[in-house]
């Protein structure tokens, strides 16, 4: 999606991945909402660490990203939201599924003139990263949550 604002073109790209996990939604949410556990399931090259109440620091050396952002954990919705305004935002939603299973939806939005907003390899890398993150999350949840 491309929009015009203030005389320049502002691009936007959104990515989403979904995965069924053989664990309850509460068990999955316990892992994703524990910000100290982010390194266990977020794949390289992304390194995100909590720095304070509602704050995180992200380091993505491949992209030259070294930035602070915000994070909001919403237990009543089984949802975690984060952002580095105005270029980036994301959320993870855990939903109940049949039996002792859950579904996890991971969404990322890139705004502005970032490589991901132009498609090609950077966009494919984001899609792969989403799939890898959900696969790692499943391993963490099912082996040692």
Region roles according to the model:
Residues 2-52:
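Hydrophobic ligand-binding cavity/cleft-lining segments
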Residues 18-22, 59, 72, 93:
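Generic structural detector for well-ordered beta-strands
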Residues 83-145:
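Beta-strand/loop substructures that line and gate deep hydrophobic ligand-binding cavities in soluble
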